[in-house]
Amino acid sequence: MQLVALGLNHHTAPLAIREQLAFPAEQLADALRDLTGSQTAHEAAILSTCNRTEIYASARDIDSVLVWLARNRGLDVEVLRPYLYALDAEATARHAFRVASGLDSMVLGEAQ
């Protein structure tokens, strides 16, 4: 297992794509159970706002997370691929701190 992040945001995807990948609050618990129960990820967190959807996971590999995301949202992997970023362990940690501090937000410092 390795630490990975897979996501898209206001920099990488138009609103129409972001809306298709967004996880409503009432779906998050089931999505996390499915993600970790599918053997794709040992542990995971999903961050979903109007400006980003990101999956942080301890996973076998990033491609398995991508396949799970596409299946869960009912989309084709190849439709999603151009809009997504995939990060390795070091880049995942750096990115998580940028997001948490609001440095990667549409408006600097906001919580989205």
Where do the protein language model's features map onto the residues?
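N-terminal ligand-binding/catalytic initiation module
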Residues: 1-112
